[in-house]
Each structure stands twice: as structure tokens, then as C-alpha cells.
Amino acid sequence: MKLIFIYGLPASGKLTVAQELVAITGYKLFHNHLVVDLLLSVFEFGSPEFVALREEIWLSIFEQACRSQLPGLIFTFAPEATVRPGFINRMLRTVADAGGEVDFIELICPLPELKRRMGSLSRLQYKKLTSVPLFEELHREGSFEAGYMPKARLSIDTSICTPARSALQIARALDLIPVN
């Protein structure tokens, strides 16, 4: 199984691009906020229980998806301070041990555009960060740095590339569709 690991700051367009990539590839989408929202119904964000269960669920889904012979899975991820050190290496090992491979895709976007996107209605569907002052504070504190991230196979600036074009670039870079 190919795990397409899309990461970037909040509001960089991870879910929107991932949805476009699903339309191209037919791969399943594992949106990070599904797990986050589940756990927020019981635990406070960042609590030890939240952090441990979030990682356990992520890794379990990756392993089972590989073992189930899915051709591919698209995962959205926002590096941040509550992700345990070593998660990326544990994820890589879990996927490899189950016979899968991981491709990292980074979405970047200038801060003014990220702040503009914070209040969009699409961010309200999940319990996503929508407060610009809180985003600024967290960014200033380095909260969106989760340590080691492997070099991305592709980095896309979503302020100058539409979600559909971004998904097409990803699909082409990963040889998921023929290059015309």
C-alpha cells in the first residue's frame, strides 16, 4: 500500500487537496481530524490520554490498511507540539513492517493567506483552529513544529496553486497517473 502523507500548517489546504487527490486516485482518505474529533469528545486536547490514543489509532489504521491490501491511503497531518517525539519514525516502521511505503507531500502557504483562511466555513465542520490570534500565538511559540519530518517528495505552495492542480501535481509526481 502507498501511504500519501500530506502535511502542512493549519489552513494550508491539506483536506481540500486530499479530497481532490481522492477524486483522481480512488484512494481512501484518512483525515486526521476524524481521530482528533473522536478523542475530543472524551479527552482534552494534548492530555496524556489524548496523545497516546491518537497515535495508537493512527498507527493501527496505517497497519490495518496495509494488511488489507488497499492500494493507497491519503493521510492529512499538521505537525504540532503534542505529537510525541519519534512518531514519524514509528509510523514509517509500522507501514514498512506491514508491507507499505510512505510518500511525504508538504503543503506550504504564506502566513497572511493562512490567517485569511482561518475563518472559512469549511474549517468549522471539524473542530479546526479558526482563531487568528490563537494561531499567531501558537505559531510564535513554535507549537506547529513536531520535530523530525522527512524530506517531502513534493512541496506545493497552495496560495498559488489550486487544490485540483495541487492534487494533479501530486498524482503525477507519485506516478499515479500518466504524465501528458
Q: Which ranges hold each PLM region?
A:
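Small-molecule kinase domains that catalyze NTP-dependent phosphoryl transfer to phosphate-bearing small molecules
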Residues: 120-169, 180
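Hydrophobic anchor at the beta1->P-loop junction of P-loop NTPases
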Residues: 6
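P-loop (Walker A) phosphate-binding loop of NTP-binding proteins
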Residues: 9
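Walker A (P-loop) ATP-phosphate-binding motif of ABC ATPase nucleotide-binding domains
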Residues: 3
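Conserved substrate/cofactor phosphate-moiety recognition/catalytic segment
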Residues: 16-66
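Conserved phosphate-donor/acceptor-positioning beta-strand/loop module used by diverse small-molecule
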Residues: 98-119, 156
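Glycine-rich phosphate-binding loop used to anchor ATP phosphates in small-molecule kinases
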Residues: 53-106
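Conserved glycine(s) of the Walker
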Residues: 13
